[in-house]
Each structure stands twice: as structure tokens, then as C-alpha cells.
């Protein structure tokens, strides 16, 4: 750990916080006091605080000298003695709308604007906004929380633990909660206001509840409640460690910066990731199930056992990202959710970003406090990390993996660990050297491409770091599990190259074509060459869904790097034209089409050919499934229809255009009542056809009026299709009004509009002109990085690259943004170069298709 990040636990080790908060919603202020019991190692100790007023610091009723240090979000205390002691601190602070610390969430109920109060203390900086503490994950302690607030009739307060002494609350107005288990400060949470919910119990007696504002219908709680109960029961069986606390409450918040937060016993969510109403799509239900399962995995991996410092954040997130799929696959096997695991976790983004020179490794040290935020890189820590955990699980076997986890939880419960502690537990359970296997994957950035070819009857396998764009090859090597389907081949590729003789004999002795990385569980791609590729493509129809998806994903990445021509991908689409798997259609096929679209300019002959390709690819799905849902159809059919119709409407396929227009007219008086699975594409179609200011205003009004987060997202996307400057100016005029667009959702508007050629120039100029406002509104929000990353994922010509560099390069002094800016420049440059080299070939391939 570098010295630039001060570690306060080295001078004071807290054991218990007895915390009282008195919150005044109307004044947006709070006062409080905290008695912190702990061991002082030194006479000079430091505690974290951010934007707090420290009124007094007492030890045994005697005032202590202290010095404020706002620059380091701290204050420093002089103690007369060391050892175990209790410091009493009185303080006050303000409630802001930054969605960090203690903050309000706003919603509309019966036409009136209301608010609830809740907390967000992760990532590293936010518990200190609510009370003085050692705000570091290693500084675990127990918490006794008491709350008082300007309550209104019917208000409810929730926290990590059950309420105690409720009979006294009627006299004092103070809500008091049971002592928490030993845990990190970032996991403390509470929420209060006009809330309601439903509860159930697991077979082991844990009370599970789903809660939201009174604006949300009670029946929208049922789905998540059922999932939560069954997932907890699954994890208890799988880990062989009981859920450790009495309750598991899940609270949907109207305003929330992250997707969800694993506070122990009181998990908080964006409403879209917890609530499922009767008019919901299969895709949204599956998304809710995965998010709930992810947060519940953290109750063991992250809460019960916690990383010692943020550089081991991957221990939390990589594991939870994998276990969400393991658990949901176990409780809902009919969803075939594991077919989507190789891609659904943002793996395509991970494989793309991880191929850019300069990317971070999964495990990286933090050299500056502001860099802690950058550790939450979803493509690397979440998606790549989960892929590595899945690779490890397969390498060990599920039985040894689960056995090792049980030992890990039992040994380290209520304490902190580093990655090596997990490796030791898994090594003991399996008899394998996990550390030597995993270190190259966690400590090195990037990943390898394995080239496979046959030369003179010798199978040659070689590894090299895979890059997209300009790079410096440093000769990195990985311990690669080959996971081949043939006998007679090595298990692992450790060196740069291996040669296996007698290929023709091996082919005779084995069934099927040679495949590496079967089930696509390891974090590398394969470049099959010559006859090996020909064999796979000839046998493509006989491969399983995951293998088909993997082959197309790998060929696309090879095209992104320039190792093969992008134009060659056009012909590969023939292989999946009649496939009915949702994952093949929505992921492999969609990724190739999205890649090809970057080479196409609007209103050109090439666009005509591209749309013809799209219509051909999805016409079979439309003819098979139609426009309207059929009674008793599978979730997969619903999701395939949704994807196919979206593409066909994009490609102006008239039968779908007319059908969508008819649906809109039938629901014109209440567009929210359109079936959720097709509502988004119906709204898009209407905007494409009508393109009027009055429709823009209608959509904006519907956006403000609804409490359905999915509907809001669909309206945002539909609005981005307008090609009307007056309408665009009207939309941009709404973005800074928090009563219209919540700050947490601003990035969705930015992403949707910036990706459309008509709006791009205007929206890009708006973002640059309003950058300081965006920074002020979202500086504490985990979506702030998106305003650097989104244009990097969209821009595709030299003019935009030059503009991106001119605007962002001067901001690289901001450590929280530096890596994303430098990565963004490289990403756009690689795209510009690829399009320049391949544009003519792609246009020709589309014309000849």
C-alpha cells in the first residue's frame, strides 16, 4: 500500500460506534453524537469526516484538543493516553442531493412531490459524511444506531438490524436498532419515510422483506421477494454457512447513484432493479433476479468476510458477479441463464477494454485517494473478474470450490482478508496451487490470444497478448487452461508455444472438431487458422449455443484488432440467420451488426445494403413469432421477438412499422399500458414516423408522470430518435431540471442522444458547455465516469477524436478521470484507424451479400 493513502486504523482501532442521529428533513440538516470505543495505538489519532462540523470531542467528560483537516477529509485528536478508551463526539452536518452520505430521494404521490431519506456509504468516502469514523474497510466495528427525525404519520424507519424498544419510540420519537455484527463502515445503512413492503421467511427463519415508497404498488414487490428467499436458501446450502443476521431487507429508492448496494441486512436498489409490476418483460424480470442474487452473494463475500483494502475490491465484485449466475441458474433452470454468462456480464466490453494498452489489472494498488473510485471499473473488476472466478471454479471443480469457500468463510468471518487468503483456502480444499495459477491473470493487465494452426501434421499452439489499437507488447505470458475437447493434449499452455505432433492421428482418435476453451469459461480468445477454422465453420450447426456464440465473438474481436478483415464477418451471419436462441440473436448477432454499423454513414447506398442485411437476419424471427405475444409462450420467445422487432423497425421493415403504429394508436390515451416487452420499440417507431414537437412533449410529460423506471428508460431511448432541432432543443432544456430528469439518469439521456448522428453535435456541445454543472451534479455519483467513457465508445472519426483530446486531455490531472481519459483516446483512435482501413471492404461485402 503506497504512503499517499493515509491509514487511520494504524493509530486507532475502533470496536463499537454508539451513534445517535437527529435528522431534520425540512431544514436539510442533522445533528448527532457518537461514542466510539476502541484502542488508541498512539497519542495522536485521526478520524474521517467530510463536510461535518465537529462541535466537541470528549474523553471521560474532559474536552480534547482537535484540529480540522478538511483537505484530507479528517480531523486529528490529541489524546492524554493510549489503550482502550471511549471518545464522545458531538457533530452536525447538512443533507445534500449528491446521493452520497445521508440524502433525500424524491418521488410523486397523488400529484404531490414527496421525499424519503436514505444512505449511501460506499465506495470509500461517504460514511464520513454522516458521522466521524475510521472510514476504511479494515476498520470493522459493531454499531448501535438510534435515529430521530421529523416524522409524519405512517413513516417507517429501516436499518441493518431489527428495531428494539419500539414501545419507547412512541414517547421519545427515537428509533433504536439492535447491535450490528462486526462490519465495515460502508455497510451501515438506514432509510425512512412513507415506506411500505412485504415480508416472508426463509426455511431457516431469516425475515426477508421488500420495501419501497407508497407510490409503488405492493404487487411489484412479489417477484423480488420470492427470488430473495430462494437465493438465500441456495447460498446457505452452497456455502454451508448460515445467513448471519436476523433480517434481509431490500429497499427500492427513487434516487440512487449505483445499481444496488449490499448494505448488510438492508440492501438498497434503484427501483428498476428491484420492482417488477404486472406489465413487465421477461428481460426485466431476469435482470432483477440477477441483481438481487448479486447483492445477496455479498452478504457472505464482502460483508461477512471483507477485503482489507480497496485494491482487493475484486474479491467482492468478481465473486458476486459469478455467484449471481450460479444461484439464478439453480433456482430458475428453465431460463438457461448460464448460456448468457460468457456475454451477459458485460464480457464483450471487458474483452474490448482489456485489449486496450494501458488498461488496469484486476488487482491494482491505489496510489492516490481519488483513484479508489476508478477501481469500480465494471468491465475489469466486475466482468473480467467474474470470468476469472468462473475459470477458477471450473479448474478446481465445483465440489472443491464450494468446500474451499466454506473453509474461507468459517476461518475469516467478521474479519478482513487479502486475495492470498482465498487462494490458501481453495488450495487446501483442492490440493492445487491456486496462487501460481491465478497470479498472472490478476496481476497482469490484458489477456492472451492463442493461435492454433497445423503445420506439417504438427498442431502448434502459441500465446501472445491480444491488443486492439496501438500498443507496446511487453511479452506477457499467462497460465492458460486449454480446456480442450480432445484427449491427448496438454491441460495448460504456460510458455509462449507448444508443438504437438501427429495431428492427423489425434483427429482420428477424437470425436468432433478441435475446440479450445470449451464452454468459454477462461479469459482468452482463440485464433483458429487454416483447416482448423474451416473444420469449425463446417461443423458450426452441430456446436452448442455457447460455442457458437464464442466463435462469433472471437472472430469479431480478431476483426477489431485487424488480424482478420472486418468484411469477413458479413458472411458469418449466414451461420446464425435461422438460429432461435435468444443469446445468439441478442448477443453474437447483435454485436456483429453493431460493429458493421460503425462503418456505415446515414443516407448512403451502404446504409441501404446494411438495412437489407438486417431485414434478412430477423425476418424469420418475425414470421415465426409475429408481433403480438402468444398465450403460454416462453420467456425466450418473448425476448427474441423484442430483439427482432427492434432491429426490423430500425431497418424500416414495413410490416413491423405498420404493426407498431397500430399498437400505439390503440393505446394512445395511455401509452404506459402498452405491453412492456414491445413498448419501447413501439415508442421508437412512433417517434421515427411522427418526429414532432408535440410527441416530444407528450413523451416528456409521460416521463415525469410515471413511477415506472423501465417506462422512463424506454421513453428516453425513444426520444433520442427525434430528428427535429426544435424538439432536440426542448429536450436539452429539460436535462438540468431535477424535477424532470434525475441526476442518476442523466447518463442514459447523454448516451442515447450522443449515439444518434442527428443529435450528436448538439449534445456533445451541450456536454462541454455544461461540464462544470455535470461535475457538480454527479461528482459523487458512480455514473460520472460515463461522461468520459460514453463518447469514447461512440466517436468514430478524426474530427471527434481531435475534439475529445482537446476537451479531456487538460483534465488528466484529475486522478479520478485520468485513466478513463487516456483509455478513451486510445479507444477512439483504434476505431478511427480500423474504419479508415476497412470501410471500403465492409461496404463492398454488404453490397455483395
UniProtKB/Swiss-Prot annotation:
One term under GO cellular component: extracellular space
GO molecular function: alanyl aminopeptidase activity; metalloaminopeptidase activity; peptide binding; zinc ion binding
Pfam families the UniProt entry points to: ERAP1_C (PF11838), Peptidase_M1 (PF01433), Peptidase_M1_N (PF17900)
Keyword tags: Aminopeptidase, Cytoplasm, Hydrolase, Metal-binding, Metalloprotease, Protease, Zinc
Disulfide bond listed as a keyword: no
UniProt binding sites for Zn(2+): 294, 298, 317
Subcellular localization, as worded in the UniProt entry: Cytoplasm
The reaction(s) this protein catalyses: Release of an N-terminal amino acid, Xaa-|-Yaa- from a peptide, amide or arylamide. Xaa is preferably Ala, but may be most amino acids including Pro (slow action). When a terminal hydrophobic residue is followed by a prolyl residue, the two may be released as an intact Xaa-Pro dipeptide
InterPro entries: Aminopeptidase_N-like_N, Aminopeptidase_N-like_N_sf, ERAP1-like_C_dom, M1_APN-typ, Peptidase_M1, Peptidase_M1_aminopeptidases, Peptidase_M1_dom, Peptidase_M4/M1_CTD_sf
Subunit: Monomer.
The protein, known as: Aminopeptidase N
Gene name of the encoded protein: pepN
Amino acid at each position: 500500500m503506497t504512503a499517499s493513502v493515509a491509514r487511520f486504523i494504524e493509530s486507532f482501532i475502533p470496536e463499537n460506534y454508539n451513534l445517535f442521529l437527529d435528522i431534520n428533513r425540512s431544514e436539510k440538516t442533522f445533528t448527532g453524537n457518537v461514542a466510539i470505543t476502541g484502542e488508541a495505538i498512539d497519542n495522536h489519532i485521526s478520524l474521517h469526516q467530510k463536510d461535518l462540523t465537529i462541535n466537541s470531542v470528549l474523553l471521560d467528560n474532559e474536552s480534547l484538543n482537535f484540529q480540522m483537516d478538511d483537505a484530507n477529509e479528517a480531523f486529528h485528536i490529541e489524546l492524554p493516553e493510549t489503550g482502550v478508551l471511549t471518545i464522545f463526539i458531538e457533530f452536525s452536518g447538512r443533507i445534500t442531493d449528491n446521493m452520497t452520505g445521508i440524502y433525500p430521494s424524491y418521488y410523486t404521490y397523488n400529484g404531490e412531490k414527496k421525499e424519503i431519506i436514505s444512505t449511501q456509504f460506499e465506495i470509500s468516502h461517504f460514511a464520513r459524511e454522516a458521522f466521524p469514523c475510521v472510514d476504511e474497510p479494515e476498520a470493522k466495528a459493531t454499531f448501535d444506531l438510534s435515529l430521530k427525525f421529523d416524522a409524519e404519520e405512517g413513516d417507517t424507519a429501516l436499518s441493518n438490524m431489527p428495531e428494539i424498544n419500539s414501545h419507547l419510540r412512541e414517547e421519545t420519537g427515537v428509533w433504536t436498532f439492535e447491535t450490528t455484527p462486526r462490519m465495515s463502515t460502508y455497510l451501515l445503512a438506514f432509510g425512512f419515510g412513507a415506506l411500505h413492503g412485504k415480508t416472508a421467511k426463509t426455511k431457516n427463519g431469516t425475515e426477508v422483506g421488500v420495501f419501497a415508497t407508497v407510490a409503488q404498488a405492493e404487487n411489484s414487490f412479489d417477484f423480488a421477494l420470492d427470488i430473495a428467499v430462494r437465493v438465500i436458501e441456495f447460498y446457505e446450502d452452497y456455502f454451508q454457512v448460515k445467513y448471519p443476521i436476523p433480517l434481509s431487507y431490500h429497499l427500492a429508492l427513487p434516487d440512487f447513484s449505483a445499481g444496488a448496494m449490499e448494505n448488510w441486512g438492508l440492501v438498497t436498489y434503484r427501483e428498476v432493479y428491484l420492482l417488477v409490476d404486472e406489465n413487465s418483460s421477461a428481460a426485466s424480470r431476469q435482470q432483477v433476479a440477477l441483481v438481487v442474487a448479486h447483492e445477496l452473494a455479498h452478504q457472505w463475500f464482502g460483508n461477512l468476510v471483507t477485503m482489507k483494502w480497496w485494491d482487493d475490491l475484486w474479491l467482492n465484485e468478481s465473486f458476486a458477479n459469478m455467484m449471481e449466475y450460479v444461484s439464478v441458474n439453480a433456482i430458475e433452470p428453465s431460463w438457461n441463464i448460464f448460456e448468457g454468462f460468457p456475454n451477459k456480464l458485460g464480457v464483450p466490453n471487458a474483452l474490448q477494454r482489456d485489449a486496450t494498452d494501458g488498461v488496469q489489472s484486476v488487482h491494482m494498488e491505489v496510489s492516490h485517494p481519488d483513484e479508489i473510485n476508478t477501481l469500480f471499473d465494471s468491465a475489469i473488476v466486475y466482468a473480467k473478474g467474474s470470468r476469472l472466478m468462473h475459470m477458477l471454479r471450473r479448474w478446481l471443480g465445483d465440489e472443491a470450490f464450494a468446500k474451499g469457500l466454506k473453509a474461507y468463510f468459517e476461518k475469516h468471518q467478521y474479519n478482513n482478508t487479502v486475495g492470498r487468503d482465498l487462494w490458501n483456502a481453495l488450495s487446501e480444499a483442492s490440493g492445487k496451487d491456486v496462487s501460481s495459477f491465478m497470479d498472472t491473470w490478476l496481476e497482469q493487465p490484458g489477456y492472451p490470444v492463442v493461435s492454433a494452426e497445423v503445420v506439417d501434421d504438427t498442431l502448434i499452439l502459441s500465446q501472445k497478448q491480444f491488443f486492439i489499437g496501438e500498443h507496446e507488447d511487453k511479452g506477457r505470458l499467462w497460465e492458460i487452461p486449454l480446456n480442450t475437447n480432445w484427449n491427448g493434449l496438454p491441460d495448460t499452455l504456460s510458455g509462449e508455444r507448444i508443438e504437438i505432433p501427429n495431428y492427423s492421428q489425434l483427429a482420428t482418435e477424437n470425436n468432433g472438431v478441435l475446440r479450445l476453451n470449451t464452454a468459454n469459461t477462461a479469459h482468452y480468445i482463440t485464433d483458429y487458422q487454416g483447416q482448423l477454422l474451416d473444420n469449425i465453420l463446417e461443423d458450426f450447426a452441430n456446436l452448442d449455443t455457447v460455442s457458437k456464440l464464442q466463435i462469433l465473438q472471437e472472430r469479431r474481436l480478431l476483426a477489431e484488432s485487424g488480424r482478420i478483415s472486418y468484411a469477413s464477418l458479413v458472411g458469418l451471419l449466414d451461420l446464425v440467420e435461422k438460429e432461435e436462441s435468444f443469446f445468439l440473436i441478442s448477443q453474437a448477432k447483435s454485436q456483429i451488426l453493431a460493429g458493421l454499423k460503425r462503418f456505415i454513414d446515414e443516407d448512403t447506398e451502404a446504409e441501404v445494403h446494411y438495412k437489407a442485411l438486417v431485414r434478412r437476419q430477423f425476418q424469420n424471427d418475425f414470421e415465426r413469432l409475429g408481433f403480438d405475444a402468444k398465450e403460454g409462450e416462453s420467456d425466450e420467445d418473448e425476448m427474441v421477438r423484442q430483439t427482432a422487432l427492434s432491429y426490423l423497425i430500425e431497418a424500416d421493415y414495413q410490416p413491423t412499422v405498420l404493426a407498431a403504429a397500430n399498437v400505439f394508436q390503440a393505446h394512445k390515451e395511455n401509452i404506459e399500458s402498452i405491453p412492456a416487452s414491445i413498448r419501447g420499440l413501439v415508442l421508437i417507431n412512433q417517434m421515427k414516423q411522427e418526429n414532432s414537437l408535440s410527441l416530444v412533449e407528450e413523451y416528456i410529460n409521460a416521463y415525469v408522470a410515471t413511477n415506472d423506471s423501465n417506462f422512463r428508460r424506454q421513453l428516453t431511448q425513444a426520444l433520442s430518435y427525434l430528428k427535429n432541432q426544435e424538439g432536440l432543443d426542448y429536450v436539452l432544456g429539460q436535462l438540468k431540471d431535477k424535477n424532470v430528469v434525475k441526476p442518476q439518469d442523466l447518463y442514459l439521456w447523454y448516451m442515447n442522444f450522443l449515439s444518434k448522428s442527428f443529435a450528436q453535435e448538439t449534445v456533445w456541445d451541450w456536454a462541454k458547455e455544461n461540464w462544470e454543472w455535470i461535475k457538480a451534479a454527479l461528482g459523487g455519483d458512480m455514473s460520472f465516469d460515463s461522461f468520459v467513457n460514453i463518447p469514447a465508445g461512440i466517436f468514430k472519426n478524426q474530427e471527434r477524436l481531435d475534439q475529445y483530446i482537446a476537451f479531456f486531455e487538460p483534465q488528466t490531472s484529475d486522478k479520478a478521470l485520468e485513466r478513463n481519459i487516456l483509455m478513451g483516446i486510445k479507444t477512439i483512435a483504434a476505431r478511427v484507424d480500423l474504419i479508415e482501413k476497412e470501410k471500403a471492404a465492409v461496404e463492398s461485402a454488404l453490397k455483395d451479400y
